[in-house]
Design a protein with these regions (language model features):
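Secondary-structure boundary/capping residues
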Residues: 62, 138, 223-224, 261-265, ...
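Short, intrinsically disordered, charge-balanced linker/junction segments flanking boundaries
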Residues: 1-2, 313-315
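Intrinsic low-complexity, intrinsically disordered coil/linker regions enriched in small/polar
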Residues: 231-241, 246-250, 255-261, 265-270, ...
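Extended ligand-binding regions for polar small-molecule ligands
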Residues: 30-84, 120-132, 194-216, 249-253, ...
Length: 315
């Protein structure tokens, strides 16, 4: 650090857990987990600590980021500057050559197609970071999930998919994709009627292609009622055709808060969770993923929650 401040070196690699002074962050990379260590055999204390962390995860929101921002974040760490090379890449996406953007039209309120316009939490979030970076873009407008999947397979049409759930980073490498940092972690919720007795005999689903679906894990042995969309899944529960539906949290919240019958409720589940990234096509410059990631770091801490409130608040 002294060498950097004195000008003896041009750049250093350092931990993010430090205050910055007269520095410019060029890039962030890699991460390491921190652990609480107890004396070997002290399982009682270990269980208490794990329980406390679970409770914080359940009720304190993104407390890790809150603590980090309180102790380490500064204007310099939040506003990452683009290099000359990155600025050159950004300039390639003009109004005459916009970035073609894809997202699923069947995941209200996360993303949906309304009269030929892509709306929802994820499209709104992308607009924020693309505008911050100065990238011109144009949303593709699939009306159905089948059209969405067809767009996914068409490299000539789709430049970036903004709602990718990847099992591993290695999978992206095999596809020669560029990937951003995660920008949203989705939790599941169980949607039921208020008179639910706790036993799931029939569960709704939209996907039986996976050998081990969410419904298999959450309601083993239950009969599956196939639906076309997740909205239909929750409607089937409201009509008494099924006992439960498992959907992403904001889907459940929006559905229940807009329900005028007062018969529906949802329960937030701690596990499993699903992390989403944006995926740059193999035909585009992968540096674009880093450009968008820098824009993500510059966004307000609670941006996703604030965007979600527009769609999920009781009206």
């Amino acid at each position: 650090e002294e060498a950097l401040q004195s000008g003896n070196v041009d750049a250093i690699a350092a931990t993010s857990m430090r205050k910055t002074n007269n520095e410019r962050i060029v890039d962030k990379f890699d991460s390491s987990d921190f652990y609480v260590i107890v004396k070997k055999g002290n399982t009682e204390l270990l269980n208490e600590i794990n329980y406390a962390i679970d409770q914080m995860n359940a009720v304190e929101g993104d407390w890790k980021t809150t603590l980090y921002n309180k102790n380490y974040e500064s204007i310099q760490t939040k506003n990452l500057e683009y290099t000359e090379k990155e600025k050159s890449i950004i300039s390639q996406y003009s109004k005459d050559n916009p970035l073609h953007v894809l997202c699923d039209p069947t995941r209200y309120p996360y993303s949906y197609n309304e009269n030929g316009e892509m709306k929802g939490i994820i499209p709104d979030y992308f607009r924020k970071i693309a505008d911050y970076a100065g990238i011109s873009y144009e949303f593709l407008t699939p009306a159905t999930r089948d059209e969405y999947i067809a767009y996914q397979k068409n490299k000539e049409t789709t430049d970036i998919s903004i709602d990718a759930r990847l099992e591993t980073d290695n999978y992206a490498e095999t596809k020669k994709w560029g990937i951003t940092a995660p920008f949203i972690t989705m939790q599941l919720a169980r949607v039921t009627r208020r008179d639910f007795d706790g036993k799931i005999n029939v569960v709704t689903t939209v996907d039986q292609t996976a050998s081990n679906s969410i419904e298999d894990a959450m309601a083993p042995g239950a009969e599956k009622l196939m639906c076309s969309t997740r909205q239909e899944m929750m409607e089937a529960v409201r009509k008494g055709k099924a006992d439960a539906a498992f959907v992403y949290y904001y889907m459940a919240q929006a559905f229940v808060n807009s329900d005028t019958t007062g018969t529906m409720t949802y329960t937030l589940l701690e596990q499993p969770t699903f992390t989403y990234r944006m995926v740059v096509s193999s035909t585009e410059n992968h540096a674009l993923a880093g450009i968008l990631t820098k824009a993500m770091y510059a966004m307000p801490q609670n941006l996703v929650e604030d965007l979600a409130a527009r769609y999920t608040t009781y009206k």
